[in-house]
Amino acid sequence: GSEMCIRDSLCPTQELVDAYEMADGTTPILGYNADGSPIINSESGYSEEGFTEEADAEGYYPENTFNMFVDREPRFYATVTYSGAYWRGRQIDFRMGAPDGRTGGPDYTTTGYLMRKFLDEDGVDILRGVFVNKTWNYFRLGELYLNYAEALNEASGPVDDVYKYVNLIRKRSGLPGLKAGLSQDEMRQKIRRERQVELALETHRYFDCNRWKISDQVKAVHGMDIGARDNSFFKRTLVEERVFEAPKHYLWPFHQDEVNKNPDIFVQNPGWGGIN
């Protein structure tokens, strides 16, 4: 999963935050233990303890930023608003009871993150009725590159063109190219991660997970502890355990009335018998 929320639009999940690389292209989270805790890459410089004392020289994060969000790749800062990030000249605070946190009403982030991607920080003022129209990208060049790279890797393995088009995406994002000598499966995992972050919040993740047949492996949704009033907010917390039954949920049901019109040739999808 990449996002969930109630009234605050799309809320990125901890799993999406984990997918972003460090600024130097290293992978901070190598996987997860059985209890959902992260397997941290000790060589990445990533930490889930403490706060930075200095702001980023390029302005990606301010001082007193939780170290989880320090020195991440540029796409992270362009996509996710985290507690401590700046928005319209002030530092956001999602802790319980804080100006941007849960205060008793329905307007709060359920994961401790909000979407920044697509938002106009300067031109929108909802309270005054000022809006900015955005053109939705149903298909864009980055997706085309990743589609081609994925298909070519599945057909021929990690040949030169696979590296070329994945690295075009990475270069534009300020990241170094992939290391040479990856196996087909290693490249497959790199492409999947690249799709997760490059196309984040663009309605791809659900369908990607289904066609890769991994939706039954990515059911848990984690975030920060939005019920905390102090720095214990910055603790991984289970937000939701989703239900996904494989193979049933990889297909949607036909309306049973349609199946009943010609049951000899029209067969309901597996697991969905009796759907009306």
Question: How should each PLM-predicted stretch be described?
Answer:
Residues 2-3, 7-276:
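Acidic/polar-rich alpha-helix caps and helix-coil junctions
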